[in-house]
Every structure is written in C-alpha cells, then in structure tokens.
Amino acid sequence: MIRGELFELECLEYLQNKYRYENVHFHHNGGMDSTMSDISVIKNGKVAFFIEVKDNTAQSGQFVVHPDADSHSFGFSSKNHSIQNPMTYAIIDYMNNDFYRFYNAGTAGAAIDIDSSVFAGWIIGHYQQRNVRYIISHDYNYVILPIRKFAEYFSITASCRIKGSGSSKPAEKDYNFITQAIKQVYKNAIFFQNNKKLYASISAVSYTHL
C-alpha cells in the first residue's frame, strides 16, 4: 500500500463519518488502478455514481498517442481506456504542430503549453464518461467539489512523455510512515517484510447491507 492509497482510505473514512445515511454507503475500490474510480457511492444497494480522490499534486488522467514518423503526426491509441472527446483532438492537434519536440520528449517530458481550459474540459469530459460526479481533496480541510468546477480548485498542466509501465516498490525510508498511516485506519494491522517488500495483514469484520 502506498501513500496515494492511504490518502484514499482517509477520504473514505471522512465520507463514512460525515455522511451517515441508512440507504447510502461508500466503498473503496482499492489499488492504484487509474482505470477504476476511487470511491463508489452506493444508494439502496446499487452504485449511483463515483467520487474521485485527488491530492494537491495528483494526476487526473492520461491518454496514449502513437507517433507516425512518416506523416509527422500523432494518433490516438486504440488501447486507451478513455474515449476521445473534443479536447482530445485539440491537444493532439497542438502536438502535431510541433511534432519533433514531442516525438523527442523522452521520459523527462515536454510541456503542452495551451490554455488550461482545454485540459479542464478534457478532465471533466473524461470523468463524466466514467460517472464521476465529485472530487474530494484535502489541504487544511476536506473539500468536496462538483466535477464541473474542477478548474476553479486546481491549477492544471499537462505534458507528453514516454512512460514506463509497472508499479514501484516503496523505499525502506518510507516504511515507518506507511505503517503508522495504515495503523491510523486499521489498528490491528500486522506488518512483515520479505524480499525487500513490505506486506500488511489486516483483519476485517464482514457484514451485509440490506
């Protein structure tokens, strides 16, 4: 479990304590899978919509493009989990107008310097397609905002970069922070290390919603 997921659990606990209704429940979908929305809002036993958890520096979405050196252009990958919206075309058109800068962006990345309203439009469309209605974040206090007001609360930037796949292991220097943060939510958690990995064992009580 890494820091981003711990933040999701803290937000889940806040929602569960703040909004106590008999017919409404919150479910953490778990993991750091960016294709899965963070928290499901379940009303009368059915998923009504989703809430996305974002800290101050979180990524809000991504899509993959493939370069074509012959035509000097980028194309939207068919393997994307997201669906194209009008802002997708605007972003790709901008990249095509400066093809070689983005083609050679490398892992460091190259900034996409267009009006942030384009990025906000893409993010809002991206989340609406996934039935995400609200964002929850935290600075000094928890803030819950409608997805349509995303740009009023966040400064948005974007870049193009070559991205490696796979998850990284937590650094040993962060183990104490990780274990203490988990214990704030799960008092009975037990930890052990094996092959430079940190594992957590958590006991939970099962229950049924009617």
Name the predicted role of every residue range.
Residues 1-74:
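Catalytic centers of nucleases
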Residues 154-155, 161-167, 171, 176:
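Conserved beta-strand/short-helix segments
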Residues 2, 28-29, 104-107, 162-164:
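Intrinsically disordered, low-complexity segments enriched in small/polar residues
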Residues 208-209:
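Conserved small/polar residues in nucleotide/adenosyl-binding loops
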Residues 35, 171, 191-192:
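Intrinsic disorder/low-complexity signature
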Residues 28, 41-43, 137-138, 164, ...:
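Surface-exposed beta-strand edges and flanking loops
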Residues 49-144, 148-151, 175-192, 199-200, ...:
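Catalytic cores of nucleic-acid endonucleases
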